[in-house]
Amino acid sequence: MPAAIASAAIAPVLTEPRIRAEQVTQLVLGETATITDLSGEWRRVCTHTDGYDGWTHAGYLCEASEQQVDQWRERATAWSEGASINIGQLRQPLPLRARVELQADTVLLPDGRRGRVISGSVRTLEQLTLAARAKAPERWALEYFAGSPYEWGGVTPWGVDCSGLVQTTFAVRGVGLPRDSAQQVFHGSAISFEATQPGDLLFFCGESTSNITHVAFAGEADTLIHSTLACGGTLVEPWLPGTRAGTLRHRLVAVRRLEDR
């Protein structure tokens, strides 16, 4: 089957092949997918990162054979930490999670363009994982995402939802998770609420449904670290009874631990 590499900084993945459709996730520059269907200039894709299905426009992609995509994935072993590069006279930002190929002191993009890092950093995934694991996951999430706006379907600090925050945080730690909180809850070890530690994942059902609709990191001293539309983005907030986030307590469904502390 044909495949593709995201060549735009962010490629929105939508529920339908039309620009006003709901965004359900994103392909970040350098991430890959299999093309499963066509509709004019739209491509239905199954993302290689997490198997998510949706539609994105061909303009966001470099289409290629499966062999070419596999070769790219073997070479693109470096990740952006929010770097910017110079391409000729142009400055191009690379969002956190963008995957590129490092060649000496230059960065190679999926479409063949080359640039030099002028701010931020680009590191191999191995280096990034070692650095990330030196910090607690919830602290890393705050360091890179605090103040990021809430965006349904987003996975980067340019805009992120609750499960995107969790997925990206653990991706840089070398732990692959599904895209949605309803699937993330099946990963890790079940923990009682009384045994909750900072860094554990807290899963909540909706106000009018038993389905899981929200995930947050447990923080220190009865706090949550999460991306929430109610506060406009990613933050740390108390969730003791009587606080705004305290209303979530009766909706807690599960606590899961992905890493021992």
Residues of each region from the PLM?
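Aromatic- and glycine-rich peptidoglycan recognition patches
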Residues: 63, 125, 189, 219-261
